[in-house]
């Protein structure tokens, strides 16, 4: 599944695909380009560090679509990408019991959850209290955050 989380509204855009290659990722980007209003001049896309996101075909697509700007957070910082938080909610609410007859049933359940979510969509709210908790944990475990890296939770 490919998914994008609109940090302003909490709306989720999603697409299921049998494989995760550059071609499918570009198809998802095309979907985003169609569904996100043209009045949104810049679409910031936070991506994990999969090779697929940096491939030649994707880079060629990106060059032709200048309103899309890719951002790759540091390794091991997936929590900085808010769609990962949404995936966690999806996992707990719909995928805990994997009782799917087939891939089609799984895709239907995923799309149904996106529809339900978008009816009550809301942005995630990070707070400075979360930063304090992260820093306290780092102090307790002796594992300081990497230098020059943002700290959030």
Predicted regions and their residues:
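Short functional hotspots at interaction and active-site rims
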Residues: 1-153
């Amino acid at each position: 599944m490919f998914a994008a989380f609109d940090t302003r509204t909490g709306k989720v855009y999603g697409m299921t695909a049998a494989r995760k290659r550059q071609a499918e990722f570009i198809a998802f980007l095309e979907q985003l380009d169609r569904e996100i209003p043209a009045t949104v001049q810049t679409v910031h896309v936070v991506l994990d560090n999969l090779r697929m996101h940096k491939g030649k075909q994707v880079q060629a697509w990106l060059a032709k679509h200048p309103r899309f700007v890719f951002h790759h957070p540091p390794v091991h910082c997936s929590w900085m990408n808010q769609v990962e938080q949404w995936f966690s909610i999806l996992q707990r609410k719909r995928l805990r019991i994997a009782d799917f007859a087939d891939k089609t049933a799984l895709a239907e359940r995923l799309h149904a959850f996106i529809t339900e979510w978008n009816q009550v969509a809301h942005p995630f709210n990070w707070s400075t209290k979360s930063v304090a908790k992260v820093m306290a944990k780092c102090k307790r475990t002796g594992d300081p955050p990497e230098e020059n890296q943002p700290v959030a939770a």
